[in-house]
UniProtKB/Swiss-Prot annotation:
This is Patatin-like phospholipase domain-containing protein 6. Residues 1313-1329 have a biased composition (Acidic residues). It holds the Pfam family Patatin. It is linked to Spastic paraplegia 39, autosomal recessive: A form of spastic paraplegia, a neurodegenerative disorder characterized by a slow, gradual, progressive weakness and spasticity of the lower limbs. Rate of progression and the severity of symptoms are quite variable. Initial symptoms may include difficulty with balance, weakness and stiffness in the legs, muscle spasms, and dragging the toes when walking. In some forms of the disorder, bladder symptoms (such as incontinence) may appear, or the weakness and stiffness may spread to other parts of the body. Boucher-Neuhauser syndrome: An autosomal recessive disorder characterized by spinocerebellar ataxia, hypogonadotropic hypogonadism, and visual impairment due to chorioretinal dystrophy. The age at onset is variable, but most patients develop 1 or more symptoms in the first decade of life. Chorioretinal dystrophy may not always be present. Residues 1-59 are lumenal. Residues 981-1147 form the PNPLA domain. The modification Phosphothreonine is found at residues 361, 464. The modification Phosphoserine is found at residues 354, 362, 372, 420. It is a single-pass type III membrane protein. GO terms for molecular function: lysophospholipase activity. It comes from Homo sapiens.
Amino acid sequence: MEAPLQTGMMGTSSHGLATNSSGAKVAERDGFQDVLAPGEGSAGRICGAQPVPFVPQVLGVMIGAGVAVVVTAVLILLVVRRLRVPKTPAPDGPRYRFRKRDKVLFYGRKIMRKVSQSTSSLVDTSVSATSRPRMRKKLKMLNIAKKILRIQKETPTLQRKEPPPAVLEADLTEGDLANSHLPSEVLYMLKNVRVLGHFEKPLFLELCRHMVFQRLGQGDYVFRPGQPDASIYVVQDGLLELCLPGPDGKECVVKEVVPGDSVNSLLSILDVITGHQHPQRTVSARAARDSTVLRLPVEAFSAVFTKYPESLVRVVQIIMVRLQRVTFLALHNYLGLTNELFSHEIQPLRLFPSPGLPTRTSPVRGSKRMVSTSATDEPRETPGRPPDPTGAPLPGPTGDPVKPTSLETPSAPLLSRCVSMPGDISGLQGGPRSDFDMAYERGRISVSLQEEASGGSLAAPARTPTQEPREQPAGACEYSYCEDESATGGCPFGPYQGRQTSSIFEAAKQELAKLMRIEDPSLLNSRVLLHHAKAGTIIARQGDQDVSLHFVLWGCLHVYQRMIDKAEDVCLFVAQPGELVGQLAVLTGEPLIFTLRAQRDCTFLRISKSDFYEIMRAQPSVVLSAAHTVAARMSPFVRQMDFAIDWTAVEAGRALYRQGDRSDCTYIVLNGRLRSVIQRGSGKKELVGEYGRGDLIGVVEALTRQPRATTVHAVRDTELAKLPEGTLGHIKRRYPQVVTRLIHLLSQKILGNLQQLQGPFPAGSGLGVPPHSELTNPASNLATVAILPVCAEVPMVAFTLELQHALQAIGPTLLLNSDIIRARLGASALDSIQEFRLSGWLAQQEDAHRIVLYQTDASLTPWTVRCLRQADCILIVGLGDQEPTLGQLEQMLENTAVRALKQLVLLHREEGAGPTRTVEWLNMRSWCSGHLHLRCPRRLFSRRSPAKLHELYEKVFSRRADRHSDFSRLARVLTGNTIALVLGGGGARGCSHIGVLKALEEAGVPVDLVGGTSIGSFIGALYAEERSASRTKQRAREWAKSMTSVLEPVLDLTYPVTSMFTGSAFNRSIHRVFQDKQIEDLWLPYFNVTTDITASAMRVHKDGSLWRYVRASMTLSGYLPPLCDPKDGHLLMDGGYINNLPADIARSMGAKTVIAIDVGSQDETDLSTYGDSLSGWWLLWKRLNPWADKVKVPDMAEIQSRLAYVSCVRQLEVVKSSSYCEYLRPPIDCFKTMDFGKFDQIYDVGYQYGKAVFGGWSRGNVIEKMLTDRRSTDLNESRRADVLAFPSSGFTDLAEIVSRIEPPTSYVSDGCADGEESDCLTEYEEDAGPDCSRDEGGSPEGASPSTASEMEEEKSILRQRRCLPQEPPGSATDA
């Protein structure tokens, strides 16, 4: 401010002086003119006797005084204003200085502007012939000056932008009470009833008519054991406590219910709806303080279902979905419980033997029997593999499908998961418009089936049997029936049929109709298949998507479930004759949670999922029977947990909890997305991570009872399972084995944090990188992606189809646009009145598919707004060969609070030039989490009509996507399956990197991310630019050849104050390779590592000048001077001093698998012991004396080198022991750091080593496992343990934290030794009677002798699960 002020003062004073002098000159000039004027001069002298007034002089003095006063006032005003301006404090960050080269550039540009102006004026001005030689000289001098002062235009740098407030901050308003005109009780009831699905306005108003207010004083009970369990209780104000009683009369609080939450058990609601209501057994609820409770009787639902029967199927389905996705998810997947969740002894129907029927027979149906074709067997979709679009049958889990026999010529349509063109909206017009249609979608039934069932024009081919049987599988046998039963063994079915067999089957069909309460038995016609499986056959495998109902006729089916963290299966229960199995998965549409295995020969009826839904469409009450059989199998412990575990919803922008809140529960994400943000002491907010479907949130704080460390808010509407702290304590007391599982979960979190915090540098320095991509990579575990075009020229339809084709190779993918939505849900689907129905349908699609793509419209339509609201991530798609622009839709997007992360995707033609000007694309946008360059096939840019485009991509979808294409790379990035390549430093030994790269390409392993240190950063940058090992080898060989030159290093020598060389020659060699390429313009995402000796920290470079940061990462101390960072002037050295193999950084950037190649030198560890002191003369003698024993003692240079690489060595050990890293080290120890002249030899060593390693990978299916979706694999598979042991995180500490239980005042007795899974009868067993002595096989005489041992084993398993009741039946702790 001072310099401009002085300049202004000088300018003002000089201007006044010029004015005064100018005025004086004018006066003199006037006087001179007066004197010389012929007429005026004489007239003046004649009249000189009369005096003339002195008015002009007085006027001048007055004007001068006025000017002086004005100037003085202005000066005083400026001084006062200057003194009043507060001095802003200097920022705490680094002070940027104006460097000398920047000054040179500034003045050089100034001179060039002057030169250009002079040149233009000289060229435009016409000159005479005499001045032409002079002008030529001037032009020549100007050209020389131009050459001397020629300054290239500086490339733009990426502007650092902070995330907008909408990304890091949650909404301040909590709840909708303040902004809604509805009463609080209506809002609370709407929130809790919404758990049962969306009810239309008439239905909801009908329910509200049955609401009852109930006021409670402190200590009053809402309900107690023995009272009816037939209501939903919603807390309007106050606080309720959910308790379980103990044998000593004391109660354990398992859950606190705050205003807005409810107390209910969906299984109890199901009992009331199905007509099997029972009183409370153990659960009670009391008021912790004066409270007001809303009570909604479950009978209100029955009245609603009477008026709207289609809603019955939908509500029961939602209850089943909650049971599987909430209760089982929390208790099995995270707490490791298995057979504790099921009741092992219920009384099924007694079918065989039956009075008056021969024991050797089993019911069959109809008079004709023939072997079914592949059309009758539903192809089961294998996880991680798209279904075969040709409709060919897929092999079973063990390659042995079960042999079905069609009992009649079926006419039901074929069920299959369709891989169809998303743009093909034909056949979708009859989409869901009712609650049953929503249930149909929820059950994941093919749309074509629904169309045919409802009389649509599209009909799937009917299952037409043929006379040619399929190849006989090992798990099934040909049915042979003869009159001598000993000849058939355990296979009672054969080609002979009789009237007696037909009558038996009719009886079995009646039993099935009775069990399912089917009023019209003809509904089973053409929908039932008879199967016989040999001993050991797997009927269905855990995780299967397309499942069926199995009704056991003869024998039994064993139900197994894989244990958590163990490669073992545990038997849950045994399905006896007369039982249904598979109802839960059929009703929910979720994958099967157990494996069905025929431990011995078994015969059963099978109803496919599509046939069962058609039966339900004809008679909706059938769903009640199926649901009741599921509830009958649940253990009383599950019923208790159904009360305690909540299913909650958080709206977009709302905070789940805030930093510093009390930790009283753990959350599991069911669908949606959450973001975790931490607020530092300075008030700055930082993004910690994002959480998607299946992630566990808040477990560390809840188990350690620490306040919440971060604020977690919803990026979009999110559903969660809530596990209260008291419930967790109750489970730990009852099943102590849960403590081991909790220790495993907690140790993973704590060890990850300790690995970040206990490095040689503080966490804030950037040295400690969290090992889990879920914590640091926001674009991981995505479920929904919105695609937004920059301009109308972007081929959106072709782009989305290409991306969907690539994603299909990873998992089921759905593409939605406004046309598809209107075709499937009707023209009014996007109206505001259909808000909840559309949200529910979209949530179902998210559950049914690995990822959902939302294609926005070209303008800001309601569908575009919906896409942005549903998205976990927004892809902004532009054309890389066009001028950087900001689209109109993007400009509208900038004005809205969009919380989803944004990524820029630039499309390039296959034959076009490489990416350029990426920085300009990024700078003109607000904060983007990343960018990608895609080289697209020619068909993407071809101009075709929609019909031709559809025809083209039908052919494309018939082929599997190329894993090396850029769209496959984008698909892996979006699904969290990125494969990273990390190259270590080691001088000339790094030439072997290229050989390993060549072998990697030949093995077919794609690379999505490249990083490196030192020579690894150089090779990695070449590969990220070229994407070809051959071209990388060619350019690296030329550079290595230049490194063997002797003259350039000699000319680069300098006085060794900082380094031996000036670095100029080395800079030129690197610049010749990369020119002025920016990191942002590389084809592959790239990073390298340097050591910042100014801040004593590790620096990770992901943007900026490529050659400078490669040079900085290769800067050896003592040889080359540190490189000044162009951004902040910090001094950068070789990254190998701190992290020579940065696999952990690649992991933090979202890599699922990291291939790390180490070429560093290995230090000698077998050093000599010389005592407490060391004499240099003694060492000299030992070295000079040829007969003396050699001693291994490091010299001063080696000691300094080892000290410099201490952190690097420790980091390398961490990388080697990590489970995500594939560590490779070629045999290059015989080569030295500067052996660049042996390039080809070192390359061959790396190539041969890579061929051997990757050949083994191919034989061991390692590559296929890398490409398998991380969410389709068993997440509970045991992994390699981290060898790092931190003194503050031992097993004892974790056990003490996790095992901590409430004081004995809240002790709860387990009742029986095995909990409720005892001989204490449940309500269902009471109904069935006390007879437990039935025959398991139904016909002991008909069983083959080979199954006797299996029967004994089965009985021993059941005997192990039985226990004698230790207390009266009334004390059994069931719900």
